[in-house]
Amino acid sequence: MKSLILYYSYRGNTQRIAERIHAAIGGDIVRIDTVVPYTGSYDDVVAQGEREVKQGFLPELKAMDIDLSRYDTIVLGTPVWWYTCAPATRAFLTAHDLGGKTVYPFATNGGWLGRTLKDVAALCPGADVKPGLDVHFDDATLRTPDKTIDRWIAAIHD
C-alpha cells in the first residue's frame, strides 16, 4: 500500500509543506479544490471564511480521481481558518471515510492553531490519527524550524 498526501491550500503555504512531505516520503499527492474558488482580497476571503466556519458550511469540491482503498497512510494538510480546519478540508473529511487508515495531520497558520488538529481527528472516526504538526507562517515566510518539520516527516515511516 502507498501513502497519499492530501491537502487544501488557499495561499500556497499548505501546498508548500505538502510538496516538501511528498519529496521526502514519496507516494501520491492530491490537492483538494472547491468548485467555486475563493476570490477577492485577502480580507474578503477571511470574512467569507469566518462566515463559512461559523455556519458549518461545506463547499462543493471538485472531483478527484483517487481510490482511498489503495492507501493505508494519509498525510492530510489544511490551513487554519478561524481556529479550525478550512471548510474545504472539512467537506472532504465529511464525505470520505478514513476509518482503518493511519492519518498524519498538519496545519498551517499565521497565528494560532486553535482546535484544528483535534477537529481533524474528530472528523476521522475509526482512523489512527497520529500527533499532528503545527506549521507557523508569517505571511509566506516559514517560522516553524526546519528541524521540527523534518523530525515530524521522519516519524511518518518509522
Regions found by a protein language model. Give the residues of each.
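Conserved beta-strand segments of alpha/beta enzyme cores
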Residues: 28, 128-131
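N-terminal beta1-alpha1-beta2 submodule of the flavodoxin-like/Rossmannoid cofactor-binding fold
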Residues: 1-76, 83-85, 90, 94, ...
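Short glycine-rich anion-binding loops that position phosphate/pyrophosphate groups of nucleotides
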Residues: 79-82, 109
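Glycine-rich, charge-decorated loop segments at or immediately adjacent to ligand/cofactor-binding or catalytic sites
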Residues: 111-123
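Short, well-ordered alpha-helix to beta-strand connector turns
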Residues: 71-72, 100-101, 127
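Short, conserved loop/helix-junction motifs that constitute active-site signature segments
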Residues: 94-100, 123-125
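Structural beta-sheet core signal
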Residues: 5, 76, 105-107, 131
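Glycine-rich phosphate/pyrophosphate-binding loop and the adjoining helix
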Residues: 130-158
